[in-house]
Curated annotation (Swiss-Prot):
GO terms for biological process: defense response to bacterium. One of its GO terms (cellular component) is extracellular region. InterPro entries: Cupiennin (IPR035164). It comes from Cupiennius salei. Expressed by the venom gland. This is Cupiennin-3c. The keyword Secreted applies. Belongs to the cationic peptide 04 (cupiennin) family. 03 subfamily. Pfam families: Cu. Keywords: Secreted, Toxin. GO terms for molecular function: toxin activity. It is found in: Secreted.
Length: 27
């Protein structure tokens, strides 16, 4: 349903944000 799609997008977004945060910390 719509809820599971939202959860999926949330997880993807969280992963992307975490990756970018890690990149910024490495610099």
């Amino acid at each position: 349903g719509f809820g599971s799609l939202f959860k999926f997008l949330g997880k993807k977004l969280a992963k992307t944000v975490a990756k970018q945060a890690a990149k910024k910390q490495m610099e």
